[in-house]
């Protein structure tokens, strides 16, 4: 297993992973969709153009997972992390996250920051096992046109549509 920074030559191999990540992310909001490889390729190119470190795990010439970091000064954000279904529960996400934490330490930081959907139990549990248990910020916005909410989320004394 090899972990390295992705380059443009990895576009064909990483695009299906990015596309599937987007499908699974939409499922958290109850939206059914299909993988869109062309959009995934475009997203990958945008990451590279923005100089976001894209960490990938490769085994036997197949990409099994990736983590996109956004660096803002000395702060590292995990923009997205995804491991192919067949490779899950094998430590790949932990290895990717360790690399992101190494980037943060190299910049003088002590943590990687994360935006997560409040019903994304998989990533919340994963992060909790790594010691990430502090709620920092919440994103609050106006509803989109025709948006359907499936639940209410409580944060402190406040309730929000989700």
Language-model segments: residues:
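A short beta-loop-alpha structural element at the N-terminal edge
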Residues: 1-17
């Amino acid at each position: 297993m090899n972990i390295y920074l992705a380059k443009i030559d990895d576009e064909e191999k990483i695009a299906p992973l990015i596309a599937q990540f987007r499908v699974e992310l939409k499922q958290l909001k109850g939206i059914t969709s299909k993988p869109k490889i062309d959009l995934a390729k475009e997203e990958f190119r945008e990451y590279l153009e923005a100089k976001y470190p894209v960490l990938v795990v490769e085994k036997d010439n197949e990409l099994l997972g990736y983590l996109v970091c956004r660096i803002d000064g000395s702060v590292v954000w995990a923009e997205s992390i995804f491991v192919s279904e067949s490779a899950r529960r094998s430590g790949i996400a932990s290895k990717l996250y360790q690399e992101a934490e190494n980037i943060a330490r190299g910049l003088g930081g002590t943590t990687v920051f994360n935006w997560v959907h409040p019903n994304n139990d998989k990533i919340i549990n994963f992060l909790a096992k790594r010691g990430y248990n502090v709620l920092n910020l919440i994103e609050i916005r106006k509803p989109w046109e025709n948006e359907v909410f499936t639940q209410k989320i409580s944060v402190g004394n406040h309730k929000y549509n989700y």
